A protein has these predicted regions:
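Membrane-water interface segments at the C-terminal ends of transmembrane alpha-helices
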Residues: 22-29, 59, 70, 134-165, ...
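Residue-level marker of structural boundaries
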Residues: 43-44, 56-57, 74, 78, ...
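Alpha-helical transmembrane segments of integral membrane proteins
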Residues: 2-3, 13, 89-130, 144, ...
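Membrane-interfacial helix-loop-helix junctions in multi-pass membrane proteins
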Residues: 53-62, 74-87, 168-180, 187, ...
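Short, hydrophobic secondary-structure boundary micro-motifs
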Residues: 36-39, 63, 78-81, 147-148, ...
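An internal, D/E-rich "acidic patch" concept
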Residues: 58-114
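Hydrophobic alpha-helical transmembrane segments of membrane transport/permease proteins
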Residues: 15-66, 159-179
């Protein structure tokens, strides 16, 4: 186990360095000059040159790269080119909102998707199965921003059950839940569609095993056979898809935050892109990469808890 964790941590470090390097050079080749964006089109050449010197943009590309890399290793991600605040402070101020939305959506998606997948598998090729497959296909086909707009039009504008703009002044528990409801449901439905299809496929495979048929032949109630015996053996593919999709879920949460005007990484990313805030973009992508790497490691370690037959090498 220890050697496995150390090996995965080594891979994580290599992945982070590769992502940091890729992000640095991609951000630098984006069109637009941060100094001109900050000062405006009316700024003179001397002011632009002075700001470029202050931001370190007049240095050679490789010098900027090694300064950025050494700072990232020390946990110093620099300061925002626009606000002048430390990047880590800017990111951490909105990160809890994105994590809150992601975790609530994840829990809702699993609560909906796992029972729906089991229900479809038990009723294979019957009406419940057909309905579940059609609904999950719709969930997979609709992009997060499209389904988000539909939810806004129906439940916020037409029915007026929820606020159009999230993150209002009402910070009570009820107000926060109302703000969170539509964005969380939007992401949870997409998550549930993935989980449903994987759970159905895994459960169908397990239900065809000899030990399941033997348990049924002994007269064990169907509910016990499915939830106590079959479910445990189909959890690994379900856990895998949850771990893999969590990274996608964070990306979709960014789009959802933009649609619902919810404070979080989404609005920060849009601002950084439009203002060519290199350091802010780099910091947010580093956070995203760290979360994905950590989730993948936790997913791998969970396999051994679910199935003792899994060996770590």
């Amino acid at each position: 186990m220890t050697s496995f964790i150390l090996k995965r941590l080594g891979f994580a470090v290599v992945t982070l360095v590769a992502v940091l390097s890729l992000v640095f050079f991609i951000v630098r080749i984006l069109p637009g000059d941060p100094a001109m964006v900050i000062l405006g089109d009316q700024a003179n050449a001397a002011s632009i040159a002075a700001l470029r010197t202050k931001l370190g943009l007049d240095r050679p590309m490789l010098v900027q790269y090694f300064v950025f890399l050494s700072g990232a290793v020390r946990g110093d991600w620099g300061v925002s080119m626009v606000s002048g605040r430390p990047v880590i402070a800017e990111v951490l101020s909105v990160l809890p909102n994105t994590i809150e939305l992601t975790l609530v959506s994840l829990v809702l998606g699993v609560i909906i998707g796992v029972p729906a997948g089991v229900w479809a598998a038990v009723n294979r090729n019957r009406i419940p199965d057909i309905v579940t497959r059609v609904v999950s296909l719709l969930g997979l086909s609709a992009p997060a921003f499209v389904s988000g707009i539909v939810l806004l039009l129906v439940f916020a504008i037409a029915l007026q059950w929820f606020p159009v703009i999230s993150g209002g002044q009402d910070q009570s528990l009820g107000g926060r839940l109302r703000d969170l409801a539509l964005p969380a449901v939007n992401l949870a439905l997409i998550m549930a569609a993935y989980v449903t299809r994987v759970t159905r496929s895994a459960m169908l495979e397990v239900l065809g095993q000899d030990y399941v048929r033997t348990a049924r032949a002994k007269g064990i109630p169907a509910g016990i056979v499915i939830w106590r015996h079959a479910m445990r053996n189909c959890l690994i593919p379900v856990i895998t898809v949850i771990g893999l999709y969590l990274g996608i879920l964070i990306g979709n949460s960014v789009l959802t935050e933009i649609v619902f005007n919810r404070p979080g990484l989404g609005k920060l990313i849009v601002g950084a892109l439009t203002q060519r805030d290199y350091t802010m973009l780099q910091g947010m992508i580093v956070i995203y990469t760290l979360i994905v790497v950590l989730v993948n490691l936790i997913t791998d370690l969970t396999y051994g808890l679910v199935d003792p037959r899994v060996q770590y090498r």
